[in-house]
Amino acid sequence: MRVNLLGVVVAAAAALAGAVIAASLLTGRGQRAASDGPGVSPAAAEIGGIPQQGIALGAPDAPRTLAYYGDVQCPYCAIWDESDLPGIVDEYVRPGELRIVFRGLAFIGPESDLGLRAVLAAGLQDQGWNLLNLLYANQGHENAGWLTESSLRRFAASIPGLDADRMLADLNAAEVESELADSRAAAQAGGVEGTPSFELGPTGGALSPVSQEELESALAG
């Protein structure tokens, strides 16, 4: 009886610790967004020197493509960007084995739409992933005013080579509208109902859904 009770206590303690860690990560994002200057995503250093084409990260001729569906206000996307993406980039993208295409969605609200448009507009300058990482690193509370044209200008100004004025002018550009429509269509076709979601397959071929839990083994396979 004592052994069983100890097991229950240990399991409860582990669950509580996991909840505390997750809450700490999510709360910390809102606090960073209120700081004086933009924080830096761990992924930012990882993507340095890797080719970007619009919303794609990695060599165009990489044999495999990972479609990543994300919302700039999704806290779990931000956690994935911070904890999982750097390792994937280092192991698969930088060596030229994988290309990641961001499929932006705006599930959460109007600030999701504004932030996504900014990422796509930055992508017209091949800086989309740099801005995406920066937004995740400075993610605030959902639709609480952390994403405005003013804050986006500040974020953009901290990225070398990104023209903030041009980015803001392109928020409603035809290319941005086209990318928005393409991502919505791809998400609908793939049955995507939440973020982050993933599809993996040969570059130029059909991509298949893969769960976040299975992504690591699928990439290694």
Residue ranges and their predicted role:
Residues 1-34, 85, 157-221:
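C-terminal cap of thioredoxin/glutaredoxin-like
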Residues 30-51:
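N-terminal low-complexity, Pro/Thr-rich disordered segments
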Residues 47-64:
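A short beta-strand-turn-helix
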Residues 54, 106, 119, 140, ...:
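Conserved short-loop catalytic and cofactor-binding motifs
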Residues 58, 96, 126, 187, ...:
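Glycine-centered flexibility sites
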Residues 59, 67, 91-93, 160, ...:
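Generic structural signal for beta-strand residues in well-ordered domains
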Residues 62, 70-154:
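Structural alpha/beta surface segment adjacent to cysteine/selenocysteine redox centers
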Residues 66, 74, 198:
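Conserved S/T- and glycine-rich ATP-binding loop of Class I adenylate-forming
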